[in-house]
Amino acid sequence: MRMLAVILALLVPSVADAAEINALISTALKAATDELLPPFERAHGHTIRASYGPSGALIPRFNAGQPADVFLTDSAAIDELIKEGKVVPGRTDLARTGIGIAVRKGAPKPDVSSPEALKQALLAARSLGHAAPAGGSITAPHIMRMFEQLGIAAEMAPKVRLAAGGPNGRVSVLISSGEADIGLQQVSELMSNPDVEVIGMLSAELQQITIYSAAVTTNAREVEAAKTLIKALSAPSAAPIYKAKGLDPP
């Protein structure tokens, strides 16, 4: 019995080893991390204080003093933070995703298989939802340029409904509520709403692929715990969960 107690003591993390990890995480990774973080906490005894937001909104929050041991955001933002000396060099790529097209579940599914087909579908829609540029979205500027590329910017302007961000301000909510007939957003975010159906992806000519990465901040208080978290999130065992949430291997 004494030997068993010793073995169990070695296997179970001690309170002294437990850490509170502050993590800033892009919304595109929320559905996946909602599943990945709890098992990590149970296995290691750590607590994750996760704070989510659009990629472009996370950095201002960090610069304003919000604590962060680890950043999970788009690779371009991580690279910029490394240049500024705010993140430790050597990012770990976790997954990638692209912009999907979605409608309310049960609604007619227009053809969006080519740039011309998408153009006609957008022109036929009464309203369209995408993220608000002012909210820090990295997809919004690309979508607006795409409208220009398709030659429909003027026609789309009065139809656009902007998602401000947050739990009730997502593109998927605009679609599921009926406020937007069709929506454009990173597919991992669209798939998180069961009342929304993804009907396709932007074609290669129009697509924007974003790689999401993780890195430890230079002012991290829990460096080793943050490294352990990144290792867990990039493990092969995490790949099926990313895939199920609309995220592919990097």
Regions found by a protein language model. Give the residues of each.
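Absolute protein N-terminus
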Residues: 1-2, 18-20
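Bacterial N-terminal signal peptides
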Residues: 2-14
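Exported/periplasmic ABC-transporter solute-binding proteins
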Residues: 19-56, 60-64, 75-85, 92-97, ...
